[in-house]
């Protein structure tokens, strides 16, 4: 019997050792699963934070470009009066040679002025046949046999814009 007892104790010892190994393995698996879950959560948080940071960076860059594009708007709007005066001077009829020379100088100044405005994003609103309230300001309505209702009959004052923003609408008369 003592051999059987010895054998039984050996089996119990092996089973106990085997159970301890299994328990240890289960504990390691549980810990590894917990660590993997923690890692996955942290990785997800990192990815979201990184994506949010990139979105903020893009939005700030867009706002910066927009601010730069429209920073000169007020200044450019004030310069339009000077532009109108130069254009009026160029349109004056001249009879003598001195007046023609002065007119030529004013024209050169006007051309240079227009190039500088264009360089800084100020553009003339192109003539539109059809009245567009986003681009035009109707000063009055006129009867016209040559124009359909809603068509621009005459441009009274040129309009300008910076990028897509109108800084001064084109003042027009519109056919009834």
UniProtKB/Swiss-Prot annotation:
Q: Where is this region: Disordered?
A: 1-28
Q: What SUPFAM superfamilies does the record tag this protein with?
A: Coiled-coil domain of nucleotide exchange factor GrpE, Head domain of nucleotide exchange factor GrpE
Subcellular location per the Swiss-Prot or TrEMBL entry: Cytoplasm
InterPro entries, per database record: GrpE, GrpE_coiled_coil, GrpE_head
Q: Name one GO cellular component term.
A: cytosol
Alphabetized GO MF terms: adenyl-nucleotide exchange factor activity; protein homodimerization activity; protein-folding chaperone binding; unfolded protein binding
Can you cite a GO biological process for this protein? protein folding
Q: Which residues form the signal peptide?
A: none
Principal localisation: cytoplasm
Which family does this protein fall into? Belongs to the GrpE family.
Function, please?
Participates actively in the response to hyperosmotic and heat shock by preventing the aggregation of stress-denatured proteins, in association with DnaK and GrpE. It is the nucleotide exchange factor for DnaK and may function as a thermosensor. Unfolded proteins bind initially to DnaJ; upon interaction with the DnaJ-bound protein, DnaK hydrolyzes its bound ATP, resulting in the formation of a stable complex. GrpE releases ADP from DnaK; ATP binding to DnaK triggers the release of the substrate protein, thus completing the reaction cycle.
Question: In its UniProt entry, what is this protein called?
Answer: Protein GrpE
UniProt source species:
Campylobacter jejuni subsp. jejuni serotype O:2 (strain ATCC 700819 / NCTC 11168)
């Amino acid at each position: 019997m003592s051999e059987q007892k010895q054998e039984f104790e050996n089996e119990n010892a092996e089973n106990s050792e085997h159970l301890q190994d299994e328990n240890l393995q289960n504990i390691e698996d549980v810990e590894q699963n917990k660590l993997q879950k923690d890692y996955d959560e942290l990785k997800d948080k990192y990815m979201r934070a990184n994506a949010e940071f990139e979105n903020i960076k893009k939005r700030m860059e867009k706002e910066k470009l927009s601010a730069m594009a429209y920073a000169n708007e007020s200044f450019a709007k004030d310069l339009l009066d000077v532009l109108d005066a130069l254009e009026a001077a160029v349109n004056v009829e001249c009879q003598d040679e001195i007046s023609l020379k002065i007119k030529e100088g004013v024209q050169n100044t006007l051309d240079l002025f227009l190039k500088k405005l264009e360089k800084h994003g100020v553009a003339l609103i192109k003539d539109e046949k059809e009245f567009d309230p986003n681009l035009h300001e109707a000063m009055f309505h006129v009867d016209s046999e040559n124009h359909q209702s809603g068509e621009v009959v005459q441009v009274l004052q040129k309009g300008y814009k910076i990028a897509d923003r109108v800084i001064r609408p084109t003042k027009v008369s519109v056919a009834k």
